[in-house]
């Protein structure tokens, strides 16, 4: 049996009774240490709570299905920060397990995406699928990121941007925004990226939500983990909610024309 267990965003406080029971009765417990960033000491705290060792897994170990031979005859659990099936990696693991006749149980929990949409005050029907922003260089400059943002903007949709990790930290905000602006320049798109909402350390004690124009956001520093929304035209309710739920970094934040 393979249990893929989402532990949400609030550390041990997000673990349900069913999840606790599944972890406590597992023969082996592993933790995904790549796809999401958990609260400091999370794995150590869960280990103490269930009174058993938790072994960290790299991305390659998860993608290679290294835990499936054990799951064929033992009760194996994989801990995932957030929701367990938001990353393709975990659905691939689920697929391979089922293909091999291994039973799979999924334990849902809150993800950064659904939490961020609500906390920012955005309308869920106006939010597009997320894009991932990697660290770019002259040798690796994926303009598909800005193409997706433009298509979403043309449809009046906000684009969630998930920021790549370097040494378990998100790329710094200034670098991420500079990359997006350079993509916009190379594609000769005008004014696609104007207003942004940045959400830092959602559900952590030092949670921060910032809202404003990109030129003002470039001057800000936020702690990892964070993600952002490239905002399309805001409706009256969204702008009203953002004005109260977030900290404005711009003196005046004009609506998208």
Curated annotation (Swiss-Prot):
Transmembrane segments: none
Name of protein: Diphthine synthase
Statement: the UniProt record of this protein carries the keyword S-adenosyl-L-methionine: yes
InterPro entries: 4pyrrol_Mease (IPR000878), 4pyrrol_Methylase_sf (IPR035996), 4pyrrole_Mease_sub1 (IPR014777), 4pyrrole_Mease_sub2 (IPR014776), Dphthn_synthase (IPR004551)
Encoding gene (name): dphB
Pathway terms, separated by semicolons: Protein modification; peptidyl-diphthamide biosynthesis
Entry similarity comment: Belongs to the diphthine synthase family.
Complex and partners: Homodimer.
HAMAP family attached to this UniProt entry: Diphthine_synth
GO terms (BP aspect): methylation; protein histidyl modification to diphthamide
Keywords carried by this UniProt record: Methyltransferase, S-adenosyl-L-methionine, Transferase
Enzyme class: transferase
Recorded superkingdom: Archaea
Classification of source organism: Archaea, Methanobacteriati, Thermoplasmatota, Thermoplasmata, Thermoplasmatales
A GO MF term: diphthine synthase activity
